[in-house]
């Protein structure tokens, strides 16, 4: 998923 523009699941 996206978290602060970083791909994290």
Curated annotation (Swiss-Prot):
<comment type="function">
    <text>Major component of a prophage tail sheath.</text>
</comment>
<keyword id="KW-0078">Bacteriocin</keyword>
<comment type="function">
    <text>Antibacterial activity against Gram-negative bacterium E.amylovora.</text>
</comment>
<keyword id="KW-0044">Antibiotic</keyword>
<keyword id="KW-0929">Antimicrobial</keyword>
<dbReference type="GO" id="GO:0042742">
    <property type="term" value="P:defense response to bacterium"/>
</dbReference>
<dbReference type="GO" id="GO:0031640">
    <property type="term" value="P:killing of cells of another organism"/>
</dbReference>
<protein>
    <recommendedName>
        <fullName>Bacteriocin serracin-P 43 kDa subunit</fullName>
    </recommendedName>
</protein>
